[in-house]
Amino acid sequence: MRKLFAVFAFLAVFFPAASYAIVPTQEQPIAVVRALDKMTARVEEIELPVGKTVQFGTLSLIAHTCRITLPEETPPESAAYLEIGEVKPGAKDIPVFQGWMFASSPALSAMEHPVYDIWLTGCKDKAAPTK
């Protein structure tokens, strides 16, 4: 048993990079999200320019960064760091979500809200079509 522990300790100390890989990404100026108003069943695709605030219903959405994996990487992935708040008249914005959203796994970091669903569909350049 001690030999097995020693082998695992050796591997953990001298080969830590074997457990993960750094994937190169490219910054994109626009995050593309899909928004659902559960009360009216309205679905809308919204383009969020990085650093700008966009309104959807009572929500304010800000994309702080949007990144895609390079085209030669498989599978392709889009990820965005989003900040979403609920705007209440005469009060401060109530934070609803702050964190990374991934286009390939929307349930991984979902926004919990009784009226709205927001999920990332991709990132894009101004001239590129939505992915």
Please name every model-derived segment.
Residues 2-8, 19-131:
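N- and C-terminal low-complexity/disordered segments
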Residues 9-13:
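Low-complexity, intrinsically disordered tandem-repeat tracts enriched in small/polar residues
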Residues 14-18:
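N-terminal signal peptide c-region/cleavage motif recognized by signal peptidases
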